Amino acid sequence: MNFDYRLATINDIDEIMIAVEDARALLKEEGNGQWQFGYPNRQDFINDINNQNLYVVLSSDTHEIASVCAITGYEEAYMHMYEGKWLTDYDYLVMHRVAVKEKYRGQGYGKALFKVFIEVGKKKGIKSLRIDTHKNNSLLIHLFDLFGFVYCGKAILPPDKDRVMYEKVLD
């Protein structure tokens, strides 16, 4: 699948929030408490936009926003795994707040976000990518596995508490 991506702008916020609400509804439908208690919210995404950390993938036909993720740097909570350890001590990027609009599910736009994550890491000269999720988020964990992320352990991250942690070392 060919796709375009770019940094999000403040003009994208309403479209981004549609993807977020679609993802929130899917998590709830699957019995996953992740994203059910006010996080992430509109202001979190506005902050990501202002910090130039929020990326959007555009649909190949209409060029509207199909999926979204934040790509950030150092994460203090990642230093405090209570089980396991990271593969490396390299500088790293983290992907957070992954969401795909309902009408684009199953069309490769979640995979596209991981391709963006890897490409951004390589462009920035980063050797390690890290990501976490709720232990019951099977769709996201499937993508971690598909893209070669390795399970490293568990950590406590608010607001969902217990998180599973993964890392991918870039070539």
Regions found by a protein language model. Give the residues of each.
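Conserved acyl-donor/pantetheine-binding loop and adjacent beta-alpha core of acyl/acetyltransferases
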Residues: 70-97, 105
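Conserved catalytic-core motifs of GNAT/GCN5-like acyltransferases
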Residues: 132-133, 145-164
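Conserved N-terminal entry element of GNAT/NAT acetyltransferase domains
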Residues: 1-14
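Conserved GNAT acetyl-CoA-binding A-motif
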Residues: 114, 121-133
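Hydrophobic adenine-recognition pocket in adenosine-nucleotide-binding enzymes
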Residues: 8, 98-100, 133
